[in-house]
Amino acid sequence: MSAVALPREQTRVWAEMGEQPEVLGRALAANEPLLDRLRTLAPLRIRLIGHGSSGHAARFGAAVVEARLGVPCDVVPAPDLGGGSALYGGGDLVLALSQSGRTPSVLSAARRAVAAGAHVVALTNDPDSPLAASAHGSLSCHAGEEVAVPATKTFLAQAALLLALAAGTGVASRALAPIAAALEARPAGVPGGPLRPGMVVGSRSAAPIAAEVALKFAEIAGHAVLGVDAAEALHGPVAAGDGPLLALAARPDLNLDLLRAHRDVVQPALPLDGSGDADADALVLAVIGQIMALDLALACGRDPDSPPHLSKVTRSA
């Protein structure tokens, strides 16, 4: 690591992280009418589409929606590998996630879902995007322009809106105060310097959050690290690497206890003792992970706003 760390305040990504409590409150309030209507649809199945950070938000959404609403819910892989319109049906609610609303593969999959008779809702930061125009309705992140390449406030808005769909706006809004406290506290990971984790693990709805935080370490800090479910880590990944495990969990977890028998585990504390809801706490843990990735990037003298080889809109098949 470089001995000279750049100030957070000189980075765009830190400014955008700091906007997250306001963005969350705005997104939840503005989208409540459509969320109410979606809760009355009673679909036979809910399918989500997304890549990258939007894919991680989709996985979080699938976990909380199925657990809380009891509706079969899954994420279409890659995002619709090989299945085309056959992956969707007339009884489906399809949630298509793309922060820009312009990811070609997500847009194509959403159009195929519409053609198959599914009810398609876009979840994007651009209500005038092609994805929003192709869908029957659109949930907006209301995040304003996100300039830094790594998604922070748009990811959080997507995940929070999916939690609000599953559990109500009141539950999702419980994350606001702990998130604001986390940004004020600026956790630095471990004493003695920023954390360079050997793996990021999460339990329950925090498992996809672990994957997102691992992506932030890669994008922001240039540190490639695996992000997996804590139970899955015990089935092989625990043997890889030699750094401490960054554990994202809001509640005691047997799998984390088992991992501690093999590896050093760092588990960040939740500000204000958390939100009182494990799924809302997962959103708080996402923000803590973002900050920890930024701390590592700045200690390394890396520009966190413009990672090499990446752009804001990613073209993929």
Residue map of PLM features:
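Conserved phosphate/anionic-ligand binding catalytic regions in large, soluble enzymes, centered on
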Residues: 10-13, 56-61, 212, 286
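Structured C-terminal subdomain patch of bacterial secreted/periplasmic proteins
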Residues: 274-300
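Glycine-rich phosphate-binding loops that contact phosphosugars or nucleotide phosphates
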Residues: 41-186, 203, 238-278, 283, ...
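Short helix-capping/linker segments at secondary-structure and domain boundaries
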Residues: 69-70, 166-174, 291-306
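Cofactor-/ligand-binding subdomain signature composed of acidic, glycine-rich
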Residues: 1-44, 149-150, 156-175
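ATP/pyrophosphate-binding catalytic subdomain of soluble kinases
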Residues: 183-227
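A short, charged, Gly/Pro-tolerant segment at domain boundaries
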Residues: 303-317
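Short acidic loop-to-helix transition motifs that present clustered carboxylates
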Residues: 32-33, 77-83, 230-235
